[in-house]
Amino acid sequence: PSDARGGQILADVTKDRKIKSVAITYTNNDYGKGLADVYKAAVEAHGIKVTTVTAHEDGKADYSSEVATLASAGGDAVAVIGYLDQGGKGIIQASLDSGAFDTFVLSDGMIGDSLTDTFGKDLDKSFGSLPGSTGKGAGVFKSVAEAAGIDSSGPYTGESYDAAALIILAMQAGGSADRTSISQNIIDVANSPGTKIYPGELKKGLDLLAKGKKVDYEGATGVTFT
């Protein structure tokens, strides 16, 4: 889903958790700013007070000054729109160390096992939202990933897998690695008619295309292009 949809869903969850006021910090790039803008508008539409909206830079060793700014504005929680291995993690660490916040609203880029491995029960009051699929492909992808020793729970793991698979299939369908050829064939391999291709079946799809057959790539996320 788009950031617009993701921000709205995160705001809906915030309302459901009975949060009355929230401070927002976002990673200082287009992803962070765009999602923060959508989230702010959506929570305010729910009657939730936004106490402050501030950017943070990734790659810093210490985020105590950023957290001090957030804490001075206050809020029942702080929404951390960023990355779990970058500044977002630092914001959480500094918040817990200072006692400024103990409830964190987490964007999709903040959700992953490494965060819970690091903070454990300190995140018990926290919540977030992550795009995903509940179709057949999602279950197949989880099994395939686990068999390969890969964590399938990270943000956009299935989407990344599908993107790579679609490019490979489009290259096979067009007989070329040329960008124009890929763009011309990617819709055909992602849509019906054709044999459905699920995670772990890339070779099957390539073999069918080599024989002049049609494929309909479902993948991990139920891919369909219009």
Residue ranges and their predicted role:
Residues P1-T226:
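Extracytosolic ligand-binding ectodomains
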